[in-house]
Swiss-Prot record:
It is found in: Cell membrane. The record marks S153 as: Required for CALCRL interaction. This is Receptor activity-modifying protein 2. Disulfide bonds join C83-C113, C98-C145.
Length: 189
């Protein structure tokens, strides 16, 4: 770390400066630092930026493209809602909503309908309405589904003892067998 020197600023206050003539960090009281931090956070928030604009600038005027897009979204919504109602009626007949094999066809049909109609009306997929429908489906039907992983437990004591004792008993037998066979091969040589 570079050693510090203290120099006087042109206004007369003392500043810490490193040997490379770079000023050191200002030493401000913690309360003042906290106040500055809070003021910076409040003034930089998007809400405060929007409030500082005049109201005439906050309201955007609809353009021809936005009206056409809004009309497409309304048409898209009228064509997609029957898909949603069909999905809901099919899901109501399913007993286990967390079993993917039972619900995958209905879920895929809903997604295909959303995608097909988005392409038909020249909208991208996913779009805000499709996202809302999919989110609604997840909140209604899959909120209580979680990944169920099997929990492993210890085997019963008799099985556990057999699994421990069997290798312990086999080791002396195998050592005896190896020694006996090595003596036998030495005797033949």
């Amino acid at each position: 770390m570079a050693p510090l020197r203290v120099e006087r600023a042109p206004g007369g206050s003392r500043l810490g400066v490193t040997r490379a003539q770079r000023p050191t960090a200002l030493c401000l009281p913690p309360l003042l630092l906290l106040l500055l931090l809070l003021l910076g956070a409040v003034s930089a928030s998007p809400e405060s930026l929007n409030q500082s604009l005049p109201e005439s600038q906050n309201q955007s005027h609809p353009t021809e493209d936005s009206l056409v897009s809004k009309g497409k979204m309304e048409d898209y919504e009228t064509h997609v809602l029957p898909c949603w109602y069909e999905y809901k009626s099919c899901m109501d007949s399913v007993k286990d909503w967390c079993n993917w094999t039972l619900i995958s066809r209905h879920y895929s049909d809903l997604q295909n309908c959303l995608e097909y109609n988005a392409d038909k009306f020249g909208l991208g997929f996913p779009n805000p309405l499709a996202e809302n429908i999919i989110l609604e489906a997840h909140l209604i039907h899959f909120a209580n589904c979680s990944l169920v992983q099997p929990t492993f437990s210890d085997p019963p004591e008799d099985v556990l003892l057999a699994m421990i004792i069997a290798p312990i008993c086999l080791i002396p037998f195998l050592v005896t067998l190896v020694v006996w066979r090595s003596k036998d091969s030495d005797a033949q040589a």
